[in-house]
């Protein structure tokens, strides 16, 4: 494709961005173009395109994908096939939730909490999706063996691609199944559990922005009537798997802090229960520790 033709395409592409979203849409357009042309951020920002540009897919498909972003509200990450999260570039498909900044904060909480002597042994990522948490844990704790569980075989295929991409296949094991079901042999042996489970109440799912409501996997979003179905199950079962002084970290909806803390205390299985806030000041994470 010629640089002149790409200039014309750019003019068309920015023209279909809805006016209220123009600023964020232009940022997305730059990411979109970079993903499929290999041009540098500076070349794209200044629109100084070389005479000839190699497209990674036909121009007609490039155009169709960009139209889908605005006509169907397909998330950019699904259109380009990757999501940037923490310091990782993760493959994503509509089979997995797009990793969020809040989950980066969840890993930061883990890093700041767990002492060196517990940064080894068995760690669980329940509901791994793209594998973001499992990969983050493996990089954070080089001496640990990570067990990544998801009920979706399609999601696990994506996770395995990402795990191999970061050469962690020997330290991250994947299991298909519902929460603890595939890892029963690990009862009593686990140092810590980290999870970003579905926590949105069913009635709230229908109010989410179209990018989420219509395109991200419902399995990863819908937490049942009160949003706590999965969290309740994890809280009740985790003590059977954790070693003494084992850790449990769960990401929550901003309004669920008090309810989740009460559920954790009601199990009488944890000696320490805390609700921690995210960088926006919202209740976001449960930290619990067994005796």
Curated annotation (Swiss-Prot):
Domain of life: Bacteria
The keyword Methyltransferase belongs to this UniProt entry's keyword annotation: yes
One MF term in the entry's GO annotations: protein-(glutamine-N5) methyltransferase activity
Catalytic activity, EC: 2.1.1.297
Catalytic activity: L-glutaminyl-[peptide chain release factor] + S-adenosyl-L-methionine = N(5)-methyl-L-glutaminyl-[peptide chain release factor] + S-adenosyl-L-homocysteine + H(+)
Sequence positions that bind substrate: 196-199
Binding site for S-adenosyl-L-methionine: 127-131, 150, 179, 196
Enzyme class name: transferase
One Pfam family of this chain: MTS
Keywords, in A-Z order: Methyltransferase, S-adenosyl-L-methionine, Transferase
UniProt GO BP: methylation
Role according to the record: Methylates the class 1 translation termination release factors RF1/PrfA and RF2/PrfB on the glutamine residue of the universally conserved GGQ motif.
NCBIfam families from the UniProt entry: hemK_fam, RF_mod_PrmC
Similarity comment text for this entry: Belongs to the protein N5-glutamine methyltransferase family. PrmC subfamily.
Name the record gives this protein: Release factor glutamine methyltransferase
Source species: Thermosynechococcus vestitus (strain NIES-2133 / IAM M-273 / BP-1)
UniProt gene name: prmC
């Amino acid at each position: 494709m010629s640089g002149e033709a790409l200039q014309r395409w750019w003019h068309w592409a920015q023209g279909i961005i809805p006016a209220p979203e123009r600023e964020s849409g232009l940022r997305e357009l730059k990411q979109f173009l970079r993903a499929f042309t290999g041009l540098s951020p500076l070349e794209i920002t200044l629109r100084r395109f070389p005479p000839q540009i190699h497209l990674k897919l036909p121009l007609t498909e490039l155009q169709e994908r960009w139209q889908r972003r605005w006509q169907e509200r397909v998330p950019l990450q699904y259109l380009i096939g990757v999501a940037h999260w923490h310091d990782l570039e993760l493959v994503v498909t509509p089979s997995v939730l797009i990793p969020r900044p809040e989950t980066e904060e969840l890993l930061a909480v883990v890093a700041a909490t767990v002492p060196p002597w517990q940064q080894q042994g068995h760690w669980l990522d329940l509901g791994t999706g793209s594998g973001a948490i499992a990969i983050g844990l493996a990089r954070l704790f080089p001496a640990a063996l990570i067990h990544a569980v998801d009920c979706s075989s399609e999601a696990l295929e994506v996770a395995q691609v990402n795990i191999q991409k970061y050469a962690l296949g020997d330290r991250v094991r994947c299991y298909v199944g519902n929460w603890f079901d595939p890892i029963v042999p690990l009862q009593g042996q686990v140092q810590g559990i980290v999870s970003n489970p579905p926590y949105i109440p069913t009635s709230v799912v229908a109010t989410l922005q179209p990018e989420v409501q219509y395109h991200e996997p419902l399995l990863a979003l819908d937490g049942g009537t009160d949003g706590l179905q999965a969290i309740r199950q994890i809280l009740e079962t985790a003590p059977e798997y954790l070693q003494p002084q084992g850790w449990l970290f769960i990401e929550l909806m901003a309004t669920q802090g008090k309810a989740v803390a009460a559920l954790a205390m009601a199990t009488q299985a944890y000696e320490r229960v805390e609700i921690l806030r995210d960088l926006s000041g919202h209740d976001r994470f449960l930290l619990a520790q067994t005796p």
